[in-house]
Amino acid sequence: RESLYVVNTYAQKYFTDTLYNSDEGKSIGLSYFKERGLSEEIIQRFQLGYAPEGRTVFTDRAIKEGYNLDYLVKAGVTIRVEGEEGKATMHYDRFAGRVMFPIHNITGRVIGFGGRALKKEAKAKYVNSPESEIYHKSKVLYGMPFARKAISTEDNCYLVEGYTDVTSMHQSGIENVVASS
């Protein structure tokens, strides 16, 4: 269980680092967030990021840095495709080429991700982490650790449609806002 938290924390840091320190991350991911009107403070508070293009860029890097492939798969950041008889098993990055929205539990630990494709030809606009030992979609609200105090103070909560709605509302100063994950 703890290993899944460790893998997700690594992935979040990797995606955030890619957003700020790669040409692809800056030109695609950071540009997208800036076009949405998000400030540096909001991008950093929500730990937003960018998953680079390439089928195995993230997974290869994680393995090279000592992360176990089985845990990458269990955490949902890597997809394993079993080869047919006589063919090799393959793996690839679940979120390649997407802006990344880490999903946090109530205490603020990263338990999953939502990734938004920016290319029109993408099969799915949003891809989310699969259910795992630490992430249960129906039990988690996106943005809750950042909204808790405001919900308590205001004694109400707005439920909005998606990740960008939550970050935009927080950007506007309305912080008692969450979305289903």
Where are the language model's segments positioned?
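Non-catalytic interaction/clamp surfaces of large macromolecular machines
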Residues: R1-Q44
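Phosphate-handling DNA/RNA-contact segment within nucleic-acid enzymes
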Residues: R1-K13, P52-S181
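Short, well-structured beta-strand/strand-turn elements
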Residues: R36-G49, G173-S181
